[in-house]
């Protein structure tokens, strides 16, 4: 997920894009037909490809994963750069496909399936621990973006992001089967 409502116009200049917010690696076990989601902190330090303002590769740098997306064009090239950084982080794990979605898009996607139901692990900002809630619209974004002022705030946020993605995938699969 991209840390912005909608794609910004970079004016064709590389290095002007938003940062990634949620970085989730989907691992498909085709033999056992299982999906595992691995959340990767946007603050994870990794080797990033650095591009100049025209998009030419000028080297690498060690920096936060969130910055990989920002070095690109805010679209496919940003996804390629983030995918390459995640691959390196996992010892050159092949990543055959990738995608990104802006915050407005995740709200629209969740709304398109009639919302998703999740159970918060902790109480915060209008959500109660252990009380299932069906997320739609702005509440979806509030749920996945809230960051507590604690050392575990980022980890809790990543868990909620993963929880929403898994609930969304399960709901879409259930609707396809109907």
What are these model-derived regions, one by one?
Residues 1-178:
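Non-catalytic, solvent-exposed segments at the cell envelope interface
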């Amino acid at each position: 997920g991209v840390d912005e409502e909608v794609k910004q116009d970079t004016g064709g200049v590389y290095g002007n894009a938003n940062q990634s917010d949620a970085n989730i690696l989907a691992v498909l076990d085709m033999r056992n037909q299982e999906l595992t989601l691995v959340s990767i902190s946007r603050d994870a330090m990794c080797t990033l490809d650095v591009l100049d303002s025209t998009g030419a590769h000028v080297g690498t740098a060690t920096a936060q994963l969130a910055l990989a997306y920002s070095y690109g064009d805010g679209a496919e090239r940003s996804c390629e750069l983030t995918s390459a950084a995640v691959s390196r982080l996992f010892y050159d794990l092949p990543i055959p496909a990738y995608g990104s979605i802006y915050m407005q898009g995740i709200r629209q996607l969740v709304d398109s399936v009639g919302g998703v139901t999740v159970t918060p692990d902790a109480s915060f900002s209008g959500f109660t621990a252990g009380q299932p809630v069906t997320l739609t619209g702005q509440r979806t974004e509030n749920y996945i973006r809230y960051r507590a002022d604690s050392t575990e705030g980022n980890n809790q946020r990543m868990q909620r992001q993963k929880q929403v993605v898994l609930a969304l995938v399960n709901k879409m699969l259930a609707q396809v089967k109907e």
